């Protein structure tokens, strides 16, 4: 939907009779706002047929290449709340390149919402001709700045840009993987539907606030939705996410708390080409803390063919795409600094019922493409004409919010040895420092193929243990499980892996 359609929907809400007039050029008075407003708008939208957004732009902006788009910069002196001595500032992105959809953005202060007007003189355009001063092109998205690393400097801590994508960093980190508001039909043969955030409401923070609140309106062919993000930057940057979905049609393959990342190569899946870097990835594994209390670790891969894995569960406790390898030596990349990229852990609040954690691994020949997706799909489709409410917490940072006492699999290595594959798994954790070495054993299984030569031994280089075994394949793919035990006590999480030719 376009900006005028958003404004028309807003004006149709009885609570806001004169709010958000459809005439975008007319001066606007602040309109009453409370958290229920966005849900009302979403519910109203869902009751009507979807209207696709108008993506028209002046030709000078519609045909930008990557470098020309990057040259368009927002003037930080014009940032929202600049000079107000507040703990957050907001800068805006111009439309162009991949980001042709306009989003309407409001500031909320003292219970009133006021649209933030687009002005071309807030931007520098490089070699691209600037739009005329009276142009009303809208924004593509925004980024949030806060003094996360130094008390006197506002670093970029989060970005909302493109479809329903957003991402964040914690203190001392660089951007890496992204989250999305919702995914629909991801990995399905009929193709994916991409919902859009079409409007945002930014609550003005108090002078001593440690968090910022962002409301978002989602719209798509199949669903409308309302979101509330409470964002707390820090050593771990935390998003509290409250969402209400109003499907126009039954959603059989809705992805909740979707994440998208990149895995190009690593020790379990090395590069076919010569590369000075041992590893290249934004995330190296999927972590699951399931409803049965089991903790799973699934190393990521860059497969030859599309791979879709499903982990059935009831009321999951946590799901994350993690970057466990933090050492520079593992990457050797001074520019990309993959070891400083965040892990993302999604913690459901309340019961999510039955469903599956979906992991999608897409073949890629370039590191510039996100080829990993993970999300939760409810077993029961989200029915049309209903309200479906979910709450969860996102943790962007170096680790899960509550590290387990169980030892972790820190590295997965695989070698080809004739007709079999040698797996070498390193495991680290404080629990292993006081273990009875004579009682340690590895438990390994495969759904297809033969497992032989299971060996466990201390690893003096890591202070942990090493578990190795041979797999003799019988088919082009096998599902593997491994864990470390001391007698009848589990010492480690459960390593799960799909081996493919």
UniProtKB/Swiss-Prot annotation:
GO terms for cellular component: outer membrane-bounded periplasmic space. It is found in: Periplasm. It comes from Rhodopseudomonas palustris (strain BisA53). Keywords: Periplasm, Signal. Pathway: Glycan metabolism; osmoregulated periplasmic glucan (OPG) biosynthesis. One of its GO terms (biological process) is beta-glucan biosynthetic process. This is Glucans biosynthesis protein G. Involved in the biosynthesis of osmoregulated periplasmic glucans (OPGs). It comes from the Bacteria. Belongs to the OpgD/OpgG family.
């Amino acid at each position: 939907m376009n900006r005028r359609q958003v404004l028309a929907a807003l004006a149709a809400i009885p609570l806001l009779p004169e709010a958000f007039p459809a005439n975008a050029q007319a001066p606007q008075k602040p309109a009453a706002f409370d958290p229920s407003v966005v849900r009302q708008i979403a519910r109203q939208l869902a009751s009507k047929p979807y209207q696709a957004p108008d993506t028209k732009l002046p030709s000078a902006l519609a045909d930008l290449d990557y470098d020309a788009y990057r040259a368009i910069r927002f003037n930080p002196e014009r940032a929202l709340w600049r000079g107000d001595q507040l703990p957050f500032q907001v800068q805006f992105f111009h439309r162009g390149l991949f980001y042709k959809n306009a989003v309407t953005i409001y500031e909320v202060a003292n219970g009133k919402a006021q649209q933030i007007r687009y002005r071309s003189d807030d931007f520098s355009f490089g070699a691209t001709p600037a739009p005329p001063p009276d142009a009303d092109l809208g924004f593509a998205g925004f980024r949030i700045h806060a003094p996360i690393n130094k008390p006197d400097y506002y670093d970029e801590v989060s970005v909302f840009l493109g479809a329903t994508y957003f991402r964040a960093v914690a203190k001392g980190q660089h951007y890496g993987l992204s989250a999305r508001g919702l995914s629909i039909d991801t990995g399905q043969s009929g193709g994916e539907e991409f919902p859009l955030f079409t409007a945002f409401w930014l609550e003005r923070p108090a002078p001593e606030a440690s968090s910022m609140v962002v409301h978002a309106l989602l719209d798509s062919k199949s669903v409308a939705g309302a979101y509330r993000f409470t964002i707390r930057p820090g050593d771990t940057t935390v998003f509290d996410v409250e969402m209400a979905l109003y499907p126009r049609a039954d959603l059989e393959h809705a992805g909740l708390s979707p994440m998208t990342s990149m895995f190009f190569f690593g020790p379990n899946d090395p590069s076919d080409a010569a590369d000075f870097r041992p590893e290249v990835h934004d995330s190296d594994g999927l972590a699951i803390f399931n409803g049965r209390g089991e903790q799973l670790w699934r190393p990521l891969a860059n497969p030859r063919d599309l791979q879709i894995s499903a982990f059935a569960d009831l009321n999951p406790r946590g799901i994350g795409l993690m970057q466990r390898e933090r050492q520079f030596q593992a990457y050797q990349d001074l520019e990309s600094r993959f070891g400083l990229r965040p892990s993302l852990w999604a913690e459901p609040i309340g019961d999510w019922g039955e469903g599956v954690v979906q992991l999608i691994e897409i073949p890629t020949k370039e590191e510039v493409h996100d080829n990993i997706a993970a999300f939760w799909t409810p077993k029961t489709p989200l029915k049309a004409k209903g309200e479906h409410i979910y709450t969860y917490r996102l943790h962007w940072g170096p680790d899960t919010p509550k590290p387990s006492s169980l030892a972790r699999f820190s590295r997965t290595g695989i070698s080809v040895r004739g007709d079999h594959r040698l797996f070498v798994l390193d495991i680290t954790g404080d629990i292993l420092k006081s273990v009875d070495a004579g009682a340690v054993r590895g438990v390994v299984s495969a759904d297809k193929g033969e497992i032989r030569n299971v060996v466990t031994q201390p690893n003096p280089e890591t202070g942990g243990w090493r578990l190795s075994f041979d797999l003799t394949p019988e088919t082009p793919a096998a599902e593997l499980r491994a864990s470390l035990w001391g007698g009848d006590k589990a010492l480690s999480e459960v390593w799960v892996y799909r081996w493919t030719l």
